[in-house]
Amino acid sequence: MVKLLGGEIEKADLLRKIGRIEQVAGARPVKLASGKAEGIKAWEIYNGSGLEFCVMESKCLDLLYAKYRGVNLSFLAKPGAVAPEYFNVHGMEFGRYFHGGMLYTCGLGNIGQSCVDEDTEYNWHGRISQTPAENTGINAEWNGDEYLISVKGDMHEAAHSHEHLVLKRKISTRLGAKSFTICDTVENQGFKREAIMLLYHINFGYPLLDRNTRVVLPTSITENYVNYTKSDEQAFRHITDPVDGSSCDTYFHRPATDASGYTSVAIINDDLRLGVYLRYLRKDFPFMVEWKNMVSGDYALALEPCTQYPLNRMSKEAQKNMQFLDCLLYTSDAADD
């Protein structure tokens, strides 16, 4: 039986009611064609449950947006979608090409502010998000009574005489599902040990994000990034209206787990009777950053599972928690969004 729209239907009966499966679920290849987004290749994926999301082949297989039954879930920053050729490694230019989106991948050489390590300049939140996917593939087919949709690709963060790190990503969903899964593997294809930093910038926006939206985050330790003091729970859990001329808050969490070692965090809008949750193994991402931006025009909330806090690779905190790859050492079954 196929589970669809809260009910069940025989596969044969479903096929009797449609001409092609793309009538209810599929992956449409698209190419953006205006402004700084011109040339971005992407797939628009929809699975019949009302869940839709856009995966950008030209930008790390990151997600430009996600919607559920027509309701936007994600944040789109002021620059909008920006093609990789506008990427600028220098200084404070990050805000000129940061699209936000449902997922913006940060790393692999740096997360946090820009810095210089020996002869290498590292930009704010790293290069990987601006890296086009290679060896890409889309697969949409029946497996018994399940219609499965997936997209995959490889992103190479590499330089002559320097690192060769490869992020292998697969994003998958199925007909009728209210979720998708991101499975990432990072490989060191070079011949020397490399530091690795990884953060998933998962960005929520209006109308899911609105006054009185709740953040559900089981945490053992929470600190305010500005002064490293223990934060009032209400401060990071409660969403307000946008405030003109205000500033954002950033909180550092050590999330709690269930008996299986998984962490689950969520954002819930009771007025819309709608929420989104992330579930992942804490051993893969021991830290969580919450970016709460109640600023008018930049109104967003990001939940950011990460390998260490985003204080750039040269900070003492990052050095203390740095992970290294000698070969294929780091794998992750990432969040269900």
Q: Where are each of the predicted segments found?
A:
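Short edge-strand/loop segments of extracellular domains
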Residues: 73, 202-209
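Acidic, contiguous internal or C-terminal segments within carbohydrate-active enzymes
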Residues: 45-59, 68, 155-202
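Beta-strand-rich interaction surfaces with strong enrichment in secreted/lumenal proteins
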Residues: 169-172, 320-324
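Conserved small/polar residues in nucleotide/adenosyl-binding loops
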Residues: 330-337
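Active-site/ligand-binding surface loops and adjacent short beta/alpha elements
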Residues: 110-113, 206, 210-282
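Short, structured beta-strand/loop micro-motifs enriched in basic residues and often containing a Trp
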Residues: 310-317
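Beta-strand-rich N-terminal accessory domains
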Residues: 1-92, 261-284, 332
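An extended acidic
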Residues: 1-23, 85-156
